[in-house]
């Protein structure tokens, strides 16, 4: 059965990678879900601000797990680049806020027909403009729960971690209640 690719942006990666190990490139569930990042996420993680807040990202376990990317054919790369240019132009003229990497994730999502996991509200708006599939970190956790890839104890622990570091996604309370019924 072919994989169901799901792209994970920087904020979702940072919220999950420490608790669900390994996070990336591990198929799970009947639909063979598999999480991927883009190479540009590794570049973002070199920022001093992120390095000081998330020093664990340089540990071998996490760096090694971030070496797997979606396989992209040459023709797809060209289409992704063209789509990126169009999306990035829209960001610069109509919807300031998303980064170049955010726009690139949207371009990949459109070409691959894969959802992007993000809690970034600007990126979510951009995805909606281009009708790219997007899901929140909580929605991904629900898929993982339903697939037996995680359990509620782990999810509650992740949420406690977010609360401790004051890193709660937008609309968290309502979304958590809607998704998990707690």
Roles of regions detected by a PLM:
Residues 2-112, 121, 156-161, 170-182:
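Active-site-proximal, substrate-binding regions of enzyme catalytic domains
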Residues 98, 105-140:
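Acidic, metal-binding active-site segment of PIN/NYN-like and related structure-specific nucleases
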Residues 124-182:
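Acidic, PIN/NYN-like endoribonuclease modules and their adjacent C-terminal/linker elements
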């Amino acid at each position: 059965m072919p994989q169901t690719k799901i792209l994970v942006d920087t904020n979702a990666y940072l919220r999950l990678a420490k608790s669900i190990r390994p996070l990336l490139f591990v198929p799970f569930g009947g639909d063979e879900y598999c999480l991927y990042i883009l190479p540009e996420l590794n570049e973002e993680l070199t920022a001093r601000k992120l390095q000081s807040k998330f020093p664990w990202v340089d540990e071998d376990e996490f760096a090694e797990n971030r070496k797997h990317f979606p396989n992209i054919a040459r023709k797809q790369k060209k289409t992704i680049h063209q789509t990126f240019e169009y999306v990035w132009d829209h960001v610069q003229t109509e919807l300031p806020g998303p980064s170049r990497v955010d726009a690139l994730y949207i371009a990949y999502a459109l070409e691959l027909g894969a959802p992007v996991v993000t809690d970034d509200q600007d990126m979510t708006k951009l995805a909606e403009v281009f009708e790219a599939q997007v899901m929140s970190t909580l929605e991904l956790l629900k898929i993982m729960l339903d697939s037996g890839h995680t359990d509620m104890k782990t999810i509650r622990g992740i949420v406690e971690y977010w609360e401790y570091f004051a890193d709660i996604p937008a609309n968290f309370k309502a979304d958590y209640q809607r998704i998990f019924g707690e």
